[in-house]
């Protein structure tokens, strides 16, 4: 591995420290600001396009330049960080410090004084600022189709960002760290195109009900503006708006809002019918060229964010961290894979199981690249400093174009934002939670027949709500492994994590377990915000809320 020089990692109860040198190249793309554009639709396009560009650009939060952290690459990094707070991504490499998200794995440095705490905030709020800049330039009563489309997209982006923030930062009860009464039901401050600097300095966290009212108002206007507009998967189109509504109403239903589950069902159906999208086929899922890296190559993705060589460097991007078949970056060294216990529970006839190597480190789906590239992945290469593949290692996310050797090609993967399969699961959960368990069970059976193709999947043992939710949740974990949406399911459904068990393939340094939801999922607000915004009351620091599993329990 010629792009990586050997590093030494010290693993201990108190710290995980990495030292090493990595040669980097830097992106050359640029963005525009509100002051640099006029109110002409053609000029606003550049400002609008800067939003998705910022979402996948190396160094987007300023943490790479300020702190030299290599996980600063935007929405893909946020998705990975949240996945590492869960249980299903195991770091299999001999040196787990090559997983640059180790602070989230360890549940260390999650308090307000740490850069890891600040990362989500330092991504989302600048992106929201870019949305506000576009929104401020367009009259919502405009009759120009291009302007309507631009405003609708900006509103949908903003709603998506606030929906993520609301779900990440709202403190939920757990068995480890009490939630003070003063912060219950609080999300994050709302900043719009009309918020002054003075207002921002005394801007309290919005109550849950107020935040969802704001999000849904943005989406309602976006729905109106985007109706009849033909937009591709790489921007929030009308189907995406309905998908975001379905996500929001599912959360509201879980929080007890009357009628919310029924609306979640309605909007999930609308997202499916409006988009015309269908679940991935086996050939699309296992495609060694386009698998989970190219939304244009399938009929499943409602939304994905494209990435070009202008947006990334050689190691600071999602592919370099996640695509294990690539011969550069951290992925072939951290060797991310599936939790062994989860793998063993997946039925052998489920074609998704081939997303990971088996217990003997053998592949059951085509490998990316040439036959020689496949040998490098499976058996390693001393000259390239690439180790042999590990049991349960991932081949779900392929390098772009199946290119395993050239990072300027292979790193240009799309970030998946929404697949139609999620709408199926939203509908299932909402049906079950609203007292329609037989319909929910039938829908799960219908979906699983698209994954276990011989029709042998059975729901006979799912006769009550709890057993159904457990099974649906497990299948959703398998379906969306690594895609960055599962933290919201864990948090909403009050599910725990199990990394420590006999035979675990998680590094013991972060093999902790928790019963029910983890306090780590109540993200702490960065000190930079509450020092400037006097109205902030923060979430408690969850760092190291429990001890690691030692094998004695």
Language model feature labels by segment:
Residues 21-79, 321-337, 342-348, 352-360, ...:
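Membrane-proximal, proline-rich intrinsically disordered regions
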Residues 93-169, 206-210, 220-231, 408-415, ...:
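Conserved, well-structured interaction surfaces
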Residues 348-419:
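Flexible, polar/acidic helix-loop-strand segments at domain edges
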């Amino acid at each position: 591995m010629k792009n990586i020089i050997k590093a030494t990692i010290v693993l201990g109860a108190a710290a995980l420290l990495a030292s090493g040198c990595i040669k980097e190249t830097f992106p050359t793309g640029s963005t525009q600001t509100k002051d640099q554009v006029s109110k002409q639709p053609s000029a606003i396009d550049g400002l609008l396009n800067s939003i998705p560009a910022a979402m996948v650009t190396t160094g987007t939060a300023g943490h790479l330049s300020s702190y030299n952290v290599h996980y600063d690459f935007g929405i893909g990094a946020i998705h990975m960080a949240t996945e590492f707070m869960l249980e299903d991504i195991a770091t299999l490499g001999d040196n787990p410090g090559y997983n640059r998200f180790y602070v989230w794995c360890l549940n260390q440095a999650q308090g307000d004084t740490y850069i890891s705490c600040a990362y989500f905030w330092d991504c989302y709020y600048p992106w929201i600022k870019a949305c506000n800049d576009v929104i401020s330039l367009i009259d919502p009563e405009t009759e120009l189709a291009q302007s309507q489309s631009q405003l609708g997209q900006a509103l949908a982006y903003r709603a998506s960002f606030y929906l993520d923030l609301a779900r990440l930062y709202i403190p939920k009860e757990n068995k480890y760290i009490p939630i003070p009464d003063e912060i219950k039901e609080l999300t994050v401050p709302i900043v719009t195109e009309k918020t002054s600097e003075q207002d921002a300095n005394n801007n309290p966290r919005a109550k849950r009900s107020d935040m969802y009212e704001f999000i849904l108002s943005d989406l309602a206007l976006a729905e109106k503006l985007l109706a009849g507009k033909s937009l591709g998967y790489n921007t929030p189109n009308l189907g995406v708006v309905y998908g975001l509504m379905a996500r929001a109403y599912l959360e509201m239903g879980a929080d007890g809002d009357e009628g919310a589950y029924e609306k979640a069902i309605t909007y999930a159906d609308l997202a499916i019918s409006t988009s015309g999208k269908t679940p991935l086929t086996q050939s699309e899922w296992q495609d060694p060229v386009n698998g989970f890296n190219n939304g244009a190559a399938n009929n499943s993705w409602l939304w994905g964010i494209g990435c070009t060589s202008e947006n990334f460097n050689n190691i600071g991007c999602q592919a370099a961290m996640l695509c294990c078949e690539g011969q550069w970056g951290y992925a072939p060294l951290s060797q991310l894979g599936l939790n062994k216990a989860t793998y063993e529970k997946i039925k052998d006839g489920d074609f998704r199981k081939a997303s990971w190597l088996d217990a003997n480190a053998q592949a059951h789906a085509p490998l990316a690249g040439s036959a020689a590239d496949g040998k490098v992945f499976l058996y390693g290469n001393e000259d390239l400093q690439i180790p042999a593949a590990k049991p349960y290692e991932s081949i779900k996310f392929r390098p772009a174009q199946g290119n395993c050797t050239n990072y300027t090609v292979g790193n240009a993967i799309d970030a998946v934002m929404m697949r139609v399969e999620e709408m199926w699961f939203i509908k299932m959960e909402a049906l079950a939670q609203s007292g329609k368990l037989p319909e929910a069970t039938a829908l799960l059976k219908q979906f699983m027949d698209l994954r276990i193709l011989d029709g042998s999947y059975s729901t006979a043992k799912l006769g009550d709500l709890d057993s159904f939710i457990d099974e649906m949740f497990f299948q959703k974990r398998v379906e969306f492994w690594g895609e960055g949406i599962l933290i919201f399911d864990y948090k909403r459904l009050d599910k725990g994590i199990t990394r420590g068990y006999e035979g675990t393939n998680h590094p013991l340094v972060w093999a902790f377990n928790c019963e029910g939801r983890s306090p780590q999922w109540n993200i702490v607000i960065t000190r930079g915000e509450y020092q400037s915004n006097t109205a902030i009351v923060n979430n408690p620091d969850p760092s190291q809320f429990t001890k690691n599993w030692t094998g004695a329990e």
